[in-house]
Each structure stands twice: as structure tokens, then as C-alpha cells.
Amino acid sequence: MAQANIGLIGLGTMGAALALNIAEKGFPIAVWNRTTEVTRKFHATAGDLADSVIPTESLADFVAAITPPRAIILMVPAGPAVDAQLEALTPLLDADDLVIDAGNADFHDTNRRSDAGLPFHFLGMGVSGGEEGARHGPAIMGGGDAADWDRVSHVMDAISAKADDGEACAARMGDAGAGHFVKMVHNGIEYADMQMIAEVYGLMRDGMGMDAGAISDVFAGWNEGVLSSYLIEISAKVTAAADKHTGKPMPDVILDRAGQKGTGRWTAIEAQHLSAPIPVIEAAVMARNVSARLDERKAGQDRFGAAPQPCDVDPSALEQALIVGKIMCYAQGFTMISGASERFGWTLDLPEIAKVWRAGCIIRSSMLNDMADALAENPDRNLILAPFFADLIERGVPALRLVVSQGIAAGHALPALASGLMWFDMMRTARGTANMLQAQRDFFGAHGFERLDDVQDTHGPWGSNA
């Protein structure tokens, strides 16, 4: 049997694209899918790359087709399917073989599998970029033992996206579940960025009465400036596209109900465990949840009337608001990553993470070069305090405040933008209102509090009033 350099299990959309990418970069690859017909069809449609792909119809034949010590990538659904696949591989692999879970795994599962004493080596690896990225160059975030990563880093460097400076967007993040954790936060930022774009789209459509073509032109113009990014680029394209069945703009024929695979929710939940404030990301998750309640929303409109009213906001103010919101959601994401690094002992390299995200992934953005520089200069400083971003925020916050206040006054739902503004105002207030919370907590629960002076008494004079 012919020998492959590497193997891949799971020929769904992402797995098939990644396998072709690997083959195209000069690494003969063995593939297996639990449904044999899928494997046969994949090989039959591989075109010029078919000679670099070894299709196999049994797991034993798949393992035998890979040159030892083996490296095997799993691209199967997260959760029990991964555990089942690891169990099936166990009797077939040698102790020095390496299995890489490249699916959207919960990092807790990756930690558990890393600590389970598997009889082979194991890496968790986040892959971002969707089908197009997997095929032509994703961003890759590895997690596990450094020596194991070194074994396959040349493959990952070859297949990953390349930043403008030519650097590969692939790196080991840290031990165990670190790679999947960073990918999870990436997805949380993705939720937030998409939601803010949707909110300004709604203001242009419902508040300013702009048609899809005009909105597309605005997005395209923004993509030439500070907001240059994959998500702004595709926003211009989707608003410009026409439905082939009706001729209407594509956004106008799409049901207003957002799907989600759960990684944004995971981010929001884990942030609570880490005491990491990420309100923009949490608002984005909430917005998707609300979008799913179509019947209740329709009933609410019937009872209270349609919410969005005309709201004439200059597109330049929307641009500035979106710039500030984007900085804030990235800042919150990096703060969460920093907290996880400390909690789990991962020593995550924040500038390296920003560099990995510069190309290939869904949240790639021109801002990430400046973020990498700011984090390299001072990784412990919140991004909003880095001079470059502080200047952008100072210039843009008045516009964000205007957009949020006018939009909310006209009945527009702006959960992510408004959450970003509230977070910013809290972050620039040295003395807020938590002293009132502490007094209340001490009144009903004798929880105590810290004082501003040197008095040692940490309880109030509530006595039996509680």
C-alpha cells in the first residue's frame, strides 16, 4: 500500500477542504470517512490532487497507509464523536503516533483528553477560516506539548494563511486546551463583530431608509480604511448580491433568525467563570438567542407597535462608532485570554495570537497588526489604553455615543454597540457605584466591605435592621 505523510479522518466540508490543502502543499495524505461512499466521492472529485490522496475504506487500512510515527488529524463533530474516534484508534496506533483534534472542541474536553493518559500523543487545534480558509489557508491555533507541535509545525505552516509580511498564521498557543480556548474566544469576537455590523446595517436600512445597494457602497468604502477586514468585505458583497429567484437583494429574502453552533455561548459562559467582563460578546450571543424567538417578537410588535423609527445618522458617525466598538470587543477578548492564561498556567503569548489572526480567519482585520504591536509593547495593558487605540477611541466615542443615543431613542435595538459604550464608561470611571452594592450585601448578608480610609470596621451599623 502507498504511504502517506499524514492522515485525516472526517470528510465533511471542513475536512475535505483541509485534506485538499494538505495534498496541494506536497504532503501525500490518507483519508477515511465512516461513510465509504463519501470517501470514494471525495477521491473521485479531487482532480489533479487525486494522486496525492490515498482513500481507505477501513480504519485499519487508513492507519496502515500512514508512515510511522503517524500524524492523524480528526475533523469530526465536537463532543462524543471525538471520544468514540479516539477509542476506535487506540488499538491500531503506536505509542509514538500523534492524533490532532482539529474540530471545534470545547477546550474543557481537550484538557480532559490531554490528561486522560491516552496511549498515543494528542494535540488540540483550532482552525478558523471556514471552508475557503481550510482549502486555501486557515489560521491555526495549536494546543499541547511543544515537542508534539514541532513534529507537525512544518505542515501547519505550509497549509496556513500568510500575513502580509509572509509570516505563517499558525502557532502553538500553549498546553492542552489552549489552542481550542483561543479559537473559542476568536469565535466570541466574531459574534460581536458580526452583531455590530448588523446593527449599523439596521440603522442604515430602517433608520435612514437606505437600500441594499447604497448600504453595500458604504461598507465597501469602509473596507478601504481603518475598518478594513474580512467581515466588512463580505458585508459589502452580501448587500450587493441579488437573489437569483426573485431579483431582490439577498438580505431582503433571508429570514431574520440567526443560527449558532455554540462557541459564542461557550465564550460567554467561560467569561463568567474567569470574571472577565466581555459585555459586547455577551450581547451578541443574546441577540442571536432573541432572534430565534420569532413568534414572540411578532406578538410583541402586534401589541406594542413596530420599534424602528426613522433615525438620520451620518454614515461617517456609524463608521466611527463601529471602529470604537471593534476595538472594544477585541480588547475584551484579549482580556479574557489573559485571564485564562493566568488561571490555567498556559503563558499565552498575546502578540502571537494577534499575529495568527491577521490572515485566514474570520476576524482578520488590518487592526490586528497594530494590536500585535501594542500587545508586544505591553501585554498587561488593556488595549484601549495603548496610545494608537486610545487616540482612535477619543476621536470615535462621541460618534458612538451619538449613534447609540439617537438609535435607542428611535427604537432601534443596538445591544452590542450599547454594551460597548456602557463598558467604556465603566472602564473610565475610577469611582463607580459598586460601593452601594457592597453596602446592600453587607446589610442583608453581613458580607463586609473594604473602606476608603484606615478604619478597621468592615461592617455597617445595620444591626437588627437586616
Identify the role of each PLM range.
Residues 178-179, 191-408, 413-414:
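C-terminal substrate-binding/catalytic lobe of Rossmann-fold NAD(P)-dependent dehydrogenases
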Residues 73-88:
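Glycine/threonine-rich flexible loop motifs
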Residues 6, 82-85, 100, 106-216, ...:
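Rossmann-fold dinucleotide-binding core
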